[in-house]
A protein has these predicted regions:
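Edge beta-strands of extracellular beta-sandwich domains
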Residues: 324-325, 353-363
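Short, compositionally biased P/S/T/A/G/V-rich stretches that sit at domain boundaries
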Residues: 269-290, 298-300
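GT-A fold catalytic core of metal-dependent nucleotide-sugar glycosyltransferases
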Residues: 95-143
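Active-site-proximal specificity loops/subdomain of glycosyltransferases
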Residues: 54-106
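Catalytic core and acceptor-binding pocket of nucleotide-sugar-dependent glycosyltransferases
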Residues: 161-245
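N-terminal anchoring/stem segment of glycosyltransferases
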Residues: 1-77, 241-276
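Short, aromatic- and glycine-rich surface loops/edge beta-strands on solvent-exposed regions
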Residues: 341-351
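Conserved catalytic core of nucleotide-sugar-dependent glycosyltransferases
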Residues: 125-187
């Protein structure tokens, strides 16, 4: 990983997520010596900055006040770039603006692996390692083309389904600020945009298109939970995008990564869930380690000819009641702390608000 730099934007709210992301990547020896540059958005205090430096070896924090001064000089010849980064609403969606310019322009080696703080590397990222070693630029695959161009939308050509939560820019010839300027000439025309948080991603989708060398990571191994089925044994990287139902799953995946591999199975059962005169098999397995219970399921809707049907689990302990929503995901899991007393488990399908909670007999 010669001359690679990792760049990540961090804010106070997502500080722990950023640390989890880097730790999950650094479990792989290929990355554990790569320098990390944290770009702060002005929300971190001295204690936060010290925590980053102390927790992550070979890390540096680029403070906003320093970055603003340097980046302003870079963008002085590009009016749309300058307006986007420093305009009247410069503090709105600031994190996206920092990603657009600061990662690359403040890089020392110009070989940038850009990470969002809400990523988790759940297994060794073999594809990322290979592409970085081969100097091939890439981006994370999205479930849609989340862009926000103004009319006429087709005046700016783009690659489809670009997600910039994980990108690799291998060198100076792969970052073209003229392409970003061109995209922004549409995106912030008359200082109007209907979805400002997508501007940065839209601009990069155009830059990647104009470059012609950027490659999408394998969408079967790089997933967005809730919106996509996740096989945690086969997935390499997960992106917990800023959507409530996605973020609800985040802590379960962090716990899953910390769940001991030598855990033992304590429960296994298949029940039938009645829906629309059909009986849907629901397979459940439960594992335990010293501190946690791991519930894994298979929602066999396709076996009865159903393509999509949301479902939920509810866990009741003497201390709390928690609902886990899984959309139409056929495979999944959730992890809870082992309760001192009894535990009750319920399951239901969900169809346009209609539910039918049924208790599952448990140990």
């Amino acid at each position: 990983m010669e001359n690679i730099e990792i760049h990540m934007l961090v804010c106070k709210k997502d500080l722990s997520m950023g640390l989890n992301c880097i730790k999950s990547l650094f479990k792989n020896k290929e990355f554990d010596q790569v320098p990390v540059f944290f770009h702060e958005d002005g929300s971190l205090d001295a204690g936060d900055i010290e925590l980053l430096k102390k927790t992550i070896n070979n890390s540096f924090v680029i403070e906003k006040k320093y970055a603003d001064e340097i980046i302003r000089s870079y963008l002085s010849k590009y009016p749309f770039c300058e307006k986007y980064r420093f305009g009247k609403k410069s503090d709105i969606y600031l994190w996206h603006k920092i990603k657009t310019f600061d990662y690359f322009l403040l890089s020392k080696t110009k070989r940038v692996l850009g990470l969002d703080s809400d990523l988790l590397f759940v297994n060794k990222p073999e594809e990322v390692i290979h592409l970085v070693q081969e100097n091939i630029p890439f981006y994370f695959p999205d479930v849609q083309s989340a862009y926000s161009f103004n009319e006429p939308k087709n005046e700016i050509p783009v690659l489809e389904n670009v997600n910039t939560g994980l990108i690799f820019i291998p060198g100076e010839e792969y970052y073209n600020i003229e392409s970003i300027e061109n995209a922004l000439s549409n995106l912030i025309r008359d200082e109007i945009n209907y979805f400002p948080s997508w501007i940065e991603q839209s601009a990069f989708a155009h830059m990647f298109y104009m470059d012609g060398r950027y490659k999408s990571l394998n969408k079967s191994k790089n997933r967005i939970p809730f919106f996509q089925e996740v096989d945690i044994k086969k997935s390499e990287c997960l992106h917990f995008v800023s959507y409530p139902d996605v973020r609800k799953l985040y802590n379960s995946y962090v716990s899953k990564m910390n769940f001991k591999e030598n855990s033992k199975k304590i429960y296994e059962k298949t029940i039938e869930v009645e829906y629309d005169f059909k009986k849907i098999p629901l397979e459940i397995e439960t594992y335990e380690d010293d501190l946690f219970l791991n519930f894994e399921f298979k929602w066999c809707i396709e076996s009865v000819g159903i393509n999509a049907l949301s479902h939920q689990f509810k866990i009741k302990t003497p201390e709390e009641e928690t609902v886990y929503e899984f959309g139409s995901n056929k495979y999944g899991f959730f992890i809870i702390k082992k309760p001192v007393d009894k535990i009750e488990i319920y399951h239901t399908y969900e169809w346009y608000g209609k539910k039918d909670w049924r208790k599952i007999e448990f140990l």
